[in-house]
Each structure stands twice: as structure tokens, then as C-alpha cells.
Amino acid sequence: IRGAFPSVVLVGMGVLLVARIGWLSDDSLITLRTALNMSHGWGPGFNVSEAVQGYTHPLWFLAWLGVGWISGQWIASVILMSLVATAAALTLVLLLPCERRIRFALLMLLALSNSFVEYSTSGLENPLSHAVVGSLMVLLVRQREVIERSFHGLAVGVVLSLVLLTRFDLVLLVAPLFIFWFIRASRSVRIAAVLGVLPLLASWFYWSLVTYDSLLPNTFYAKRNVNLSFMELFDQGFFYLRTSLAYDRAGGLLLLVGVVLTLAFMKPLAVASSLGIVLYLTYVASNGGDFMVGRFLSVPVYLSALSIAVSLEGWSLEPLVQSFRQNRMNSLLVRRFIGPPLLLVLSAILISSATAFSRQQSERFNWERPASRGIADERPMYVQRGSGFMRYFSEISVAVKSTYDPRTEDSSIVEISRRANGWPTRKDSEIQRPLTVRTTCGLLGGKSIISG
């Protein structure tokens, strides 16, 4: 118990840090509206009686649908899911077989990573992505202990299917890891893995095809249906990644160290992880990136932290520490002349821009300026509009209530919660199509919840 106490404290502090700057993005409310319509009898689409898969994260959608329907608290449920998934992701880092001080250092760097911390909430699938990717890595790392057990193969297959159902493009991130494991596994374990993957994926694809007449989300086809050349898309996507790294120096450091250690130690799982990260980021760039700075960097940054732990397995800081303790001159040089300046420079690099530890959480740049090329610093912008978790916590007695008043235009997280909790149920005698249709451009999710 005594040995686990520091780990529990660190994970708890990490969750509190994430909750402190937690927020709800407008895109997540598109998923929420679909879940509300489906749970209240209006059909499995964003618009009433129109079956279109407007969300990109089936497993996150199903989890939100289930927890929200059972609890009746739709915003509280996504806050809870995000924080639980974040706690799981941080705990999984501590389960990897490397020295404890290294694991603690990785948690600190993740806490300084803007992309990881900011998108551990947002209402999007990122926290679940962290948790399922981390679960897969832990299972693969421990393959040497149970590689001949069919149950282990079944577990790997099930977790892989959860990764894919969380977001289908994550297949590029984890495919090298799975292929490496699959080649080394015995025949019985391979069969078990396939049996673990197929049922969940087949069930979802069947339901999606019957319900939406499509295997993939509508957003996949929307992103590909643009009148732009590959080089134009890649240029914008590369700019997106560069901008995201500029505002997430800790994340960039994790990615860089992950690559360096992979090349230095050449551990197979670390090599597979780095290859997956390269494939995934190349795919993000080829699609033109995104408008939310850092969103598609959080999972690669987290996987890179896991890769570092794998690379440093069996490597200990203790001999280095002991040698410095025994040599007084080296110890004096490090403590007085090398350590403090190095720590100061590293801190200046990491904390020169706003992080989760900063009190100031205003927008780091204006998305409307031409130099931003449409990329926005989403979290501070929505917090200023009242979509931060702290606003919800401070008015929780009001937020848990139910209301349905289409006259109000308040789109804060508190009003979104009240409106979602009071979502009307369609009766059999009611018509399926609305009497009025509203069109809007921008902030579609929030406006759709407020308008009902």
C-alpha cells in the first residue's frame, strides 16, 4: 500500500488538473444531440427521422448514450466518462515495466502537454482513445508472460476492436503494434485474437449498414469530398501539425524523445509504436489536419510516452545516481552549476506558453488572423463562452435540473445540461418531422441543443 500511495496521488492530481481546465467543445454536442434523439425516440440521427451518422466515434457515442440514458444527466455523464478514462490512461503508464522515477517523469510531461490535457476532456473521444490505446500497449508489453495463452489473444483482439470502434483511423496508429504481436503469437493465440476482433466490429458494421446505409461515418466521406489537390491538403495538414507542436512543447518533446530512444535501443514494440505514430500523423496531414489545434496530437503524444517507457525497460537511473553521490566533485558540479541552469532552460521551454499549470487560460492566438489559416485555440474560446467544467461545478445545483424553454439563447454548459436533461420524448401520436427547420453555420452543436 505504501508503495502504491505516490502513484495514486499522482493519478489523482492529474485527474484534478484535467478537471480544472475541462471544457465542452461544440463538436461534441453534435454527438450529444444524436444520442438525445435516439434515446428519446426521435431516431439515430442529428435531425429528426434522418438516419445520418454524423459522429466519428461509435464507441464513445454508445458509452455516452448508455450512461446518459441511465443517469438522466447528459453533461455530468460525459464529464464523468472523461475523467474516469483519463485516470485509466494515467494508471496504465504506471503499469509499464520501467523504473518508477521514469514513469513519474512521463506523467509530469503528459501533464505539461497541452494537447493531452486539453483533449482529455472536450466531450470528444480523445480520453477514451488514450485509455484503449494504453490498454492495448500494456497487453502487448506483457505478452512474454502469457504469449501462449489463448485468453491473452482474445483480450488483445477485444481491445483492438475497442480501439477501432473508438475511432476508425486509429487503425494506422496501432496496426504496426498488432502486426508485430500477431506474427510472434502461436496459432491458437492468433485464432483467439481474430475471434476477439470480429464479433464487435461485425456487429457494429452490420447495424451501421442497416441503420445508416453506410459502413463509415458521414464525416469520412465529407473530408474526402473536397475539390483540393493532395499537395494543398498536405500543406494545410503539415501546417496544422506544426502549429499544434508550437503550442505543445512538452508533447513535441515526448515525440522527439520517443523517436531518439527508439533508434537508440531498437526495442521491437517501441519501433512499432513509432512507425504507427508516423503513419497516423502522415494521414492527419494528408487530410488537411483539423481546425482544433492539438486535437489530433494527443493520442500520438500519449503513445510516445508509452513507447519511451518500453524503450527504457530494464534501464535504471540508480547507478548514475550512486556514482554522482560517491564522486563529490561531480555531485557539486551537477547540483550547483549544471543542474539549475539546465532545469531553468527546460522549464522556460516547456512553460513559455500557457499550460494546464498556468492561471491565465486565454486564447493563445486569434484564429481569424490570416496566419492561423483557420486553426483555432478552441478550449480557451469555449471556456470564455461558459463551456468550462468549472462553470458546471460552480452551478451544479442548477445544471442537474431539467428545462425545455426554446426562448432562451444562453448556450453555456449549465443551460446545455438543463436543456439536454429536459429533452422531449416523441410519442407515437406525434409527427416524425419537425414543423420548422433552422439553418446555421458555425456553433452547430450548441445551437442544435438550445433550439431543441
Language model regions located:
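Membrane-proximal envelope and lipid/glycan-remodeling enzymes
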Residues: I1-G452
